[in-house]
């Protein structure tokens, strides 16, 4: 029965692919827009209570606050207070306690109202926010969530170590309790934005005698603390996109602990799954998804004599893969009503990395030698290869 079902789905999908690849880009995009408008019109006839609540909160916010003229941090603060930061968070934590997919309504309406796009330097908000909301106590959530969302306090991730990359639970950074504080010693590496961050998501070993998954504790580390040293990691290109962080007798208040002592593994899993969510869904990373637009631009700029059917077919295959990925992300988001993403986003991250890798290779082949003078094509292709785990 299962084999027959899979064959039927494959057959239906192949028919869809064959149909789409015979269409022009304009026809495809027009069809997509028409479907979106149809679904929107159908949805407007019967709005559920949670959707109505979000729209009412947006109406109230936009009546008294104009995002196109206000200071961005001030507007985001008002947005947090209205429960429109992360709508699936609890009331008082920047949310309304509704299902997470309603965040899309908030983002769409605020964009239409002239709100500024999210600053890429606040990317780790998408990781730290859900972790603190899920595992932090009331005082931790009250202290960190609002300034994190407004962008007044930027965050970084302090997970990987020279001897603990894929084997994250094998980390060696130690935290020893001293009254109401913890003394931290160790090194972290590959830390994006650590040089501009105010706080770091820090996972340490607090019980070396316990099994390695059990003796870990999660902290919010003040990156300005005495004993914290951030060093840039210079790449062969001359750039320094990553850092390494050294901690020598750094004192961390117990009030900055996220979750119970020894429960750092559970808290870190929330961070890691939201990282997959952010990357897999195409959010937070400035160029994520831009490869598809690049491929279209390269195609449109090509001489007509070079636009053979095989190349057009390959380009349309990329479009289908990107659209399937987008719809898969939407479905995964709808299923994650608890606000904790599942393994689907790990798969999506790999799928998007493979897709972008193929798109960059496609552009390189179309451009030939001209691709060598473009940073994005020559460097992003191997970068996506690394991101996909190869």
Which residues does each PLM region occupy?
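Low-complexity, intrinsically disordered or signal/transmembrane-proximal segments
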Residues: 7-9
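A structural signal for short hydrophobic beta-strand segments in well-ordered beta-sheet cores
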Residues: 173-176
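A short core secondary-structure module
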Residues: 185-231
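C-terminal helix-coil-helix/basic helical segment that borders enzyme active sites and/or dimer interfaces
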Residues: 323-386
């Amino acid at each position: 029965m299962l084999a027959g079902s899979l064959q039927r789905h494959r057959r239906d999908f192949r028919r869809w692919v064959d149909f789409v690849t015979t269409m022009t880009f304009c026809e495809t995009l027009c069809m997509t827009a028409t479907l979106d408008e149809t679904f929107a019109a159908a949805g407007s006839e019967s709005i559920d209570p949670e959707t109505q609540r979000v729209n009412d909160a947006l109406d109230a916010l936009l009546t008294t606050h104009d995002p196109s003229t206000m200071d961005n941090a001030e507007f985001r603060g008002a947005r947090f207070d209205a429960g429109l930061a992360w709508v699936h968070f609890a009331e008082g934590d920047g949310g309304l306690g509704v299902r997470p997919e309603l965040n899309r309504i908030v983002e769409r309406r605020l964009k239409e109202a002239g709100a500024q796009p999210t600053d890429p330097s606040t990317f780790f908000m998408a990781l730290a926010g859900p972790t603190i909301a899920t595992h932090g106590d009331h005082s931790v959530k009250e202290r960190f969530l609002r300034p994190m969302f407004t962008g007044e306090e930027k965050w970084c991730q302090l997970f990987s170590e020279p001897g603990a990359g894929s084997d994250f639970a094998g980390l060696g950074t130690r935290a020893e309790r001293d009254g109401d504080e913890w003394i931290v010693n160790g090194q972290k590496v590959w830390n994006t934005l650590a040089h501009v961050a105010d706080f770091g998501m820090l996972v340490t070993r607090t019980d070396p005698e316990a099994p390695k998954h059990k003796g870990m504790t999660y902290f919010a580390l003040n990156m300005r603390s005495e004993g914290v040293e951030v060093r840039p990691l210079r790449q062969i290109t001359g750039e320094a996109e990553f850092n390494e962080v050294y901690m020598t007798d750094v004192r961390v208040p117990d009030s900055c602990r996220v979750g119970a002592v020894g429960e750092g593994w559970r808290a870190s899993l929330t961070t890691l799954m939201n990282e997959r969510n952010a990357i897999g869904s195409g959010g937070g990373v400035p160029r994520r998804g831009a490869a598809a637009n690049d491929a279209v631009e390269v195609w449109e700029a090509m001489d007509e004599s070079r636009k053979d059917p095989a190349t057009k077919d390959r380009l349309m295959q990329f479009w289908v893969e990107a659209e399937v990925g987008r719809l898969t992300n939407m479905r995964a988001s709808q299923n994650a009503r608890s606000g904790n993403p599942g393994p689907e986003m790990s798969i999506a991250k790999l799928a998007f990395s493979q897709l972008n890798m193929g798109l960059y290779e496609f552009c390189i082949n179309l451009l030939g030698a001209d691709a060598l003078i473009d940073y994005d094509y020559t460097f992003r292709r191997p970068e996506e290869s690394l991101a996909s785990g190869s």
